[in-house]
Amino acid sequence: RFECQGSGKCCVSRDSYGFVYLSNIDLKRFSKFFKLSLKAFKKKYCQITDGFIHLAEKDELKGNCIFLKDKMCTVYKSRPSQCRTWPFWNDNMNTKVWNKDISVNCPGVGKGKLISQKKINQILKEDLDTEKSILKSRIIPLK
């Protein structure tokens, strides 16, 4: 069972989770949402670490998402795939991880309707496809 409770807990840093990585699809979706060119969106809201584009981190936010305001996602309808697929990430589909971390920190676990195995598999596929896309779009600096 899972239903998002809108707690914003998945958007705050707990030291074990880091960047919100962005695929090309995510970048285009955000650019459209903000009515900015890709270049302008990247300049205003992104950083590159180890060749990967991710949402910028601000020191004053202590690792929390830049789009989290009053425990609410201000870009929910255009949120990136990494956020859309939470908590059904491939890395989380381990009973130990799920029981020790995910179910403890995500109040939506165990709430709402039962999510079918078919739906979970679709989400896992989206997560995997996004990871592949992000890896393929890595920016390798010239030496």
Which functions belong to the PLM regions below?
Residues 1-143:
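Short loop/turn segments that flank or connect secondary-structure elements
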